[in-house]
């Protein structure tokens, strides 16, 4: 059995240059989400070495580095906490999130699509930023949510998007502006029941646009889908690699949603530029155990 080469590539010089303003944010985020203390990482497996050029980095040096590059290196297999003990990764949290005290609205059967073929859908997908004033139908909203991460094999709990370990850390919050038969407001998608939970009624256009740095597409959309993650669902099992897997899954869910919108003749636009704290506050999330990752605006496209 051949022995693996454990030498790791050296981060670029640019990756180790100061990035003012991001030090505190990235350090706290990676420490909380990654579940380990940056700067105190060392090999867990015999023969493994820290990435060249990073072994001597301490907590005081983090502000002088691209923490994304360091996290990528340190989350490779074989690199974990020093001090002789692994961090406490915690226990597995509940697999689903519900709002038991709010109104629950069953969604229509999502089957029976009259949509483009998969080949046509992939070829036609574009980022669409302008929408008509036409309402989105409840049937289409049901299909979008089911395509994003609805149950596809209920007996085993499998969903439409792949998930590391089938742990499903991603939550979906539709901010509904104009859907036939639905009150405007903040909703939560209960995938197990294929239903919506009305978290708070009201017009969220101003709030989501402010959080989204003034992007007009967020105010025009019939629905803005916000994807969040409950990190512990993945962290307890996959440890320092959990954050990688969570972000990958957000991409899977987002692409499902975009392709479903395109196949239904709708327009969709993905948005990654937003103020995290403002968006988390808008949704009522703490930004630590659960945090917003992604916004996808959907509406009836202009011709």
Where are these regions (language model features)?
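N-terminal amphipathic, basic helical "cap/leader" segment at the start of enzyme domains
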Residues: 2-5, 27-220
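N-terminal Sec-pathway targeting helices
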Residues: 18-28
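A glycine-rich helix N-cap at a beta->alpha junction
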Residues: 285-303
């Amino acid at each position: 059995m051949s022995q693996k080469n454990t030498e790791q590539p050296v981060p670029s010089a640019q990756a180790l240059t100061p990035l003012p303003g991001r030090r505190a944010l990235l350090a706290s985020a990676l420490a909380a989400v990654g579940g380990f203390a940056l700067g105190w990482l060392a090999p867990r497996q015999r023969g493994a070495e820290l990435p060249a050029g990073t072994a001597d980095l301490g907590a005081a040096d983090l502000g002088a580095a691209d923490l994304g590059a360091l996290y990528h290196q340190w989350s490779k297999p074989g690199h974990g906490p020093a001090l002789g003990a692994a961090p406490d990764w915690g226990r597995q949290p509940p697999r689903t999130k519900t709002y038991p005290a709010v109104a629950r609205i069953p969604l229509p059967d999502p089957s029976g699509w009259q949509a483009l073929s998969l080949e046509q859908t992939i070829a036609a997908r574009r980022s669409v930023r302008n929408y008509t004033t036409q309402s989105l139908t409840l049937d289409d909203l049901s299909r979008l949510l089911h395509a994003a991460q609805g149950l596809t094999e209920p007996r085993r709990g499998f969903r439409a998007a792949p998930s590391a370990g089938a742990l499903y850390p991603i939550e979906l919050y539709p901010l509904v502006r104009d859907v036939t038969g639905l009150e405007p407001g903040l909703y939560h998608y209960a995938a197990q029941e294929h239903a919506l939970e009305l978290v708070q009624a009201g017009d969220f256009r101003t709030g989501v646009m402010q959080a989204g740095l003034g992007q007009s597409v967020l105010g025009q959309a019939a629905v803005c889908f916000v994807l969040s993650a409950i990190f512990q669902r993945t962290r307890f099992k996959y440890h320092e690699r959990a954050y990688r897997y969570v972000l990958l899954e957000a991409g899977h869910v987002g692409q499902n949603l975009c392709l479903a919108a395109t196949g239904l003749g709708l327009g969709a636009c993905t948005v990654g530029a937003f103020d995290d704290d403002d968006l988390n506050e808008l949704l009522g999330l703490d930004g630590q155990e659960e945090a917003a990752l992604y916004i996808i605006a959907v509406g009836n496209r202009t011709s």
